[in-house]
């Protein structure tokens, strides 16, 4: 075996050390999304039942966070590129703590509904900004610590931290609000953000990357095809997250929550076991296979005659969706100079925010007009379009590589 080939196969110890370096910074993403997940399932009931507002107002008060995240993506990318990932994460955690203080105030002013809802909306807006800063900063911090060769692993672990925290946070938040009082959630958000801020300060920053910085508009244009692919793939996740329980209820099937569990389990399992395939086979090839699995799973949900088939469909969808973000994300980030990686990552992530924001209302229209199964058929068509788009991008990349080699 040559020295080059020996070096290309990391030892178990070096692989573990790399993973440890990644986890040490994406843990701040976990903390950030815990502050999001803890009050998430409690707030709609608080706004509707305690404050007396309509379900529409309750939904809007929760959803405003996602618009804040979307609007602050350019800010997060610029901060990560110019201030550095560590300072970006610290600012994001500070915003999470501030959102906790505003949330605590909203609970304290529950006797005055108008004041309480204003404080709650302010809390959600600040939390959305914090989510954007921490999510972008943590990924770039991880890449800076382990090198660009491990981009896919960093993005994959960051996603595990994100969905893991949301899965844990929501039920824990409900349990705490029932056992104690909802105001405790505000205190817990402040405490978690403070803990994250303290721990983040202890970790060494990575050097700023100097060099050419592209304008955000130029970066957005460059990653547009990859972002469209991400949006197509996210439609399946959005459809399952929003409508799987209603789909089960319409068919009088039990255990709708189990389908969400298997979706999440296969999602995390795929990221843990197969993230390295992106480095080995390239992002586009992995994306093509991932979209195909997602499409197959969504078609099974559409046609499922019994709950067991729907369960397999949810599992395949989670398995397929798992690697779409990192697979296309690695290719998107590679298109820009190193000094613009933060902008590329934030611009690419915008399409996830947009897709999840648009999928709900569109899928709701489809469900009302044609029935719940057709929601998953439409998502399957989107995944099939993702296969086609990824194939075109892969072929274009191969042509460019071939012409470059010939030159």
Swiss-Prot record:
InterPro entries: MFS, MFS_dom, MFS_trans_sf, MFS_Transporters, MFS_YhhS-like. It comes from the Bacteria. Gene3D superfamilies: MFS general substrate transporter like domains (1.20.1250.20). Keywords: Cell inner membrane, Cell membrane, Membrane, Transmembrane, Transmembrane helix, Transport. This is Uncharacterized MFS-type transporter BURPS1106A_3201. Belongs to the major facilitator superfamily. YhhS family. GO terms for cellular component: plasma membrane. It is found in: Cell inner membrane. GO terms for molecular function: transmembrane transporter activity. It holds the Pfam family MFS_1. The chain crosses the membrane at residues 22-42, 51-71, 101-121, 126-146, 154-174, 179-199, 227-247, 258-278, 286-306, 309-329, 347-367, 369-389. It is a multi-pass membrane protein. The lineage of its organism: Bacteria, Pseudomonadati, Pseudomonadota, Betaproteobacteria, Burkholderiales.
């Amino acid at each position: 075996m040559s020295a080059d080939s020996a070096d290309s196969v990391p030892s178990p110890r070096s692989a573990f050390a790399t993973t440890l370096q990644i986890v040490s910074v994406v843990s701040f993403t976990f903390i950030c999304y815990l502050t999001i997940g803890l009050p998430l399932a409690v707030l709609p009931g608080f706004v509707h039942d305690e404050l007396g507002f309509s379900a529409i107002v309750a939904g809007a008060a929760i959803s405003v966070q996602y618009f804040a995240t979307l609007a602050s993506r350019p800010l997060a990318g610029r901060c990560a590129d110019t201030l550095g990932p560590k300072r970006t994460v610290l600012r994001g955690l500070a915003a999470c703590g501030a959102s906790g203080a505003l949330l605590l105030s909203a609970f304290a002013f529950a006797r005055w509904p108008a004041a309480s809802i204003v404080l709650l909306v302010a809390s959600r807006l600040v939390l959305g900004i914090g989510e954007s800063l921490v999510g972008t900063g943590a990924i770039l911090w991880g890449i800076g610590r382990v090198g660009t060769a491990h981009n896919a692993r960093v993005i994959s672990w960051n996603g595990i931290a994100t969905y893991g925290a949301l899965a844990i946070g929501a039920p824990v938040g409900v349990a705490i609000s029932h056992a104690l009082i909802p105001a405790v959630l505000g205190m817990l958000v402040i405490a978690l953000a403070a803990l994250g801020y303290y721990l983040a300060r202890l970790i060494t920053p990575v050097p700023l990357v100097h060099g050419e910085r592209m304008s955000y508009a130029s970066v957005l244009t460059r990653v547009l095809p990859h972002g469209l692919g991400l949006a197509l793939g996210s439609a399946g996740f959005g459809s399952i997250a929003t409508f799987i329980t209603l789909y089960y209820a319409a068919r009088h099937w039990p255990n709708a929550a189990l389908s969400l569990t298997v979706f999440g389990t296969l999602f995390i399992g795929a990221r843990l076991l197969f993230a390295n395939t992106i480095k080995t086979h390239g992002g586009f090839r992995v994306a093509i296979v991932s979209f195909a699995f997602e499409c197959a799973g969504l078609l099974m949900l559409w046609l499922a005659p019994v709950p067991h088939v729907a369960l397999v469909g949810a599992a395949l969808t989670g398995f397929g969706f798992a690697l779409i973000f990192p697979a296309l994300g690695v290719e998107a980030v590679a298109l820009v100079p190193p000094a613009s990686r933060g902008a590329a990552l934030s611009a690419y992530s915008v399409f996830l925010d947009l897709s999840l924001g648009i999928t709900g209302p569109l899928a709701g229209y489809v469900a009302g007009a044609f029935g719940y199964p057709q929601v998953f058929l439409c998502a399957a068509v989107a995944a099939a379009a993702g296969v086609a788009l990824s194939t075109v991008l892969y072929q274009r990349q191969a042509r460019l590589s071939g012409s470059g080699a010939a030159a």
